[in-house]
Design a protein with these regions (language model features):
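Carbohydrate-binding surface patches
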Residues: 371-411, 452-453
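C-terminal beta-strand-rich structural cap/linker in extracellular carbohydrate-active enzymes
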Residues: 433-459
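Glycan-recognition and catalytic regions of carbohydrate-active enzymes
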Residues: 340-387, 423-427
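N-terminal accessory beta-strand-rich subdomains and adjacent acidic, glycine-rich linkers
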Residues: 4-87
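An acidic-aromatic substrate-binding cleft motif
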Residues: 59-141
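Conserved, mostly hydrophobic/aromatic
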Residues: 134, 210, 237, 330, ...
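Aromatic- and carboxylate-enriched substrate-binding clefts and catalytic-loop regions
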Residues: 145-320
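Solvent-exposed beta-strand/loop surfaces of large extracellular or lumenal domains
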Residues: 415-439
């Protein structure tokens, strides 16, 4: 069983909390009464006092959907779109301009490029380097994360002098790459109409809006208004620092992704007791049921339990290299980040080229197997090509995949699997090309914290 909700416009979102045994209770965020600016870099509005009610609405207002999803087994939860189906239909007449894709992201790798003749950081030269990398690999976007706007001002029209956005936008356009801007929610909310109009006219393709960190009625309403006004100016929205999806991505399809997850960015500061690997094989059955997830995978520096440590400047993932590749298939993410630096990706060209080929939207999805907290395998099709991703927890695991859905014909698989030394050296992997047998059964072996990624195509 999984509980969720959708269509929560004009009222705070509820949470389900375990209360011992099988008992469940709900909690609602009350309406803010008094607030002040504060939080991370003065980018938030913090609630200092709340009212004694959870929503202010009209007498005949429609109530949100509250649902319980019942599945016969764990894997059915990993391919359930009830939240999307029950959400309000699209209010957008034209969605032809919405372009899902992958994003070269600089913040996780701390602008970590080497071998260049300029100082890497928040400046034109660095972002042109990321744009060049994205263009070479067919990556649709580059994001300018926190730092392009003047710190502590909460003003998206005050740009640091090292950045010339018009120049970068023009350069990216020449390279067939779009730019996405990060924004603290308070700075965005202060004048979102003006912000969206101005940056849309400049050629910006979307905003990654962050640090909402609330789910009361006022903040839920902000999400709707941000989606609506962004859509008016043909801008995509990626909500970070937010609550789980509740169907807004159906009502406004320009809402291209949500964070609302303990994603890979946590590895920059999480201690050795954080078990991200087990989380990775739990989240797809629960959180992903609500909607897409901006997990921000793609690390080329990988570590086992013994070697992992946090680092803000040179972060790493828990688990193997192939786990990172497989997550691009397992996790649903229409706007999918490449979290590592161009330097690290260029050094790992084989893995980078594979990631670059993986679509971000799909025509068919099959949850092949899985058990919450232990393992999962997802198969997804785009056109005539199938991608399959498997993840395991900290237990090494052998799975026999049933590929009977492929149908007739001769098929080949390009396969990235954990190397024989991956339990000790998490970045060890092997790439093989194999024929899919007539039995349509294929055995994959995963190391501790491992994964396996396949691209399957007809001969």
């Amino acid at each position: 069983l999984v509980g969720s909700e959708m269509c929560i416009r004009d009222r705070g979102m509820f949470l389900i909390n375990r209360n011992g045994g099988t008992a469940l209770t709900s909690a609602f965020a009350a309406v803010p009464k008094t607030k002040k600016q504060g939080g991370h870099n003065q980018l938030q509005i913090l609630v200092t006092e709340r009212e004694n009610y959870i929503a202010s609405c009209q007498p005949k207002a429609k109530l949100p959907w509250r649902i319980i999803v019942v599945a016969r087994n764990d894997k059915e939860l990993a391919d359930n779109d009830m939240v999307y189906k029950l959400a309000a239909p699209s209010r957008m007449k034209d969605i032809s301009w919405i372009r899902p894709g992958k994003v070269a992201w600089e913040w996780w790798n701390h602008w970590g490029i080497k071998g260049v003749d300029f100082e890497a950081g928040i400046n034109n030269e660095t972002y042109m380097h990321y744009i060049d990398f994205a263009s070479r690999h067919g990556i649709e976007y580059v994001i300018l994360d926190e730092g392009w706007a003047v710190n502590l001002k909460a003003d998206l029209f005050q740009i640091v002098p090292e950045i010339d956005l018009k120049k970068l936008t023009a350069y990216a356009r020449q390279k067939n790459v779009g730019l996405i801007l990060w924004a603290g929610y308070h700075a965005f909310a202060r004048d979102m109409e003006h912000v969206c109009k101005h940056y849309s006219e400049m050629g910006i393709k979307g905003f990654k809006i962050d640090f909402m960190d609330r789910d009361d009625q006022e903040m839920v309403d902000f999400h709707y208004r941000a989606a609506e006004i962004a859509a008016k100016y043909k801008l995509m929205v990626d909500f970070h620092g937010t609550y789980k999806p509740t169907g807004l991505n159906r009502t406004y399809p320009n809402v291209i992704n949500y964070e609302a997850v303990h994603g890979l960015e946590q590895m920059k500061w999480s201690d050795i007791h954080t078990d991200q690997v087990t989380y990775d094989v739990t989240m797809p059955f629960i959180r992903m049921l609500a909607g897409p997830v901006d997990y921000t995978q793609g690390a080329m520096h990988n570590a086992n339990k013994r070697c992992y440590h946090s680092s803000m400047d040179t972060p790493m993932s828990q688990g193997t290299r192939c786990r990172q590749l497989a997550e691009y298939v397992v996790f649903e993410s229409p706007l999918n980040m490449l979290c590592d630096s161009p330097t690290n990706y260029d050094r790992e060209e084989e893995c980078t080229e594979f990631i670059a080929t993986i679509p971000t939207v799909w025509e068919q999805t099959i949850a092949m197997n899985g058990e919450i907290g232990k393992y999962i395998t997802m198969a997804r099709r785009k056109g005539d090509v199938w991608y399959v991703g498997s993840l395991t927890n900290w237990d090494a695991r052998t799975l026999t995949l049933d590929l009977s859905f492929l149908g007739a014909g001769r098929w080949k698989a390009e396969m990235f699997h954990d190397g024989v030394n991956a339990n000790r050296l998490a970045s060890d992997y092997q790439k093989t090309v194999t024929d899919i047998p007539a039995s349509r059964k294929l055995t994959v072996k995963m190391a501790q914290g491992g994964g396996c990624a396949l691209k399957i195509y007809k001969e």
